[in-house]
């Protein structure tokens, strides 16, 4: 029986952030590549079309494991426990953190998804 894309995706979803980081590094070493997004070159200056360097992390759904999501929100925002709980329990979508560099936002997003939340960038 061959491994399908769905099997791989399911396995990746079950991995922790640190395990995913190690996997990316192993793939980079094994295939002698660098995991970075390709950049398309436009004919003229297209500054307005460029991807933003900073984003706001929006919590769209806390999921079924609110306690885990609250812990992550508390950790990444520096809020107290009650303030983090109010943020998660409040009206969604809500900005968890604003003006975050893409690299940091990806790490925070992975933590929130691992805790069971749904997240998007704005």
From Swiss-Prot:
GO terms for biological process: translation. GO terms for cellular component: cytosolic large ribosomal subunit. It holds the Pfam family Ribosomal_L12_N. Keywords: Ribonucleoprotein, Ribosomal protein. GO terms for molecular function: mRNA binding; structural constituent of ribosome. Homodimer. Part of the ribosomal stalk of the 50S ribosomal subunit. Forms a multimeric L10(L12)X complex, where L10 forms an elongated spine to which 2 to 4 L12 dimers bind in a sequential fashion. Binds GTP-bound translation factors. Forms part of the ribosomal stalk which helps the ribosome interact with GTP-bound translation factors. Is thus essential for accurate translation. PANTHER family: 39S RIBOSOMAL PROTEIN L12 (PTHR45987), LARGE RIBOSOMAL SUBUNIT PROTEIN BL12M (PTHR45987:SF4). Belongs to the bacterial ribosomal protein bL12 family. This is Large ribosomal subunit protein bL12. It comes from Mesoplasma florum (strain ATCC 33453 / NBRC 100688 / NCTC 11704 / L1). The gene is rplL.
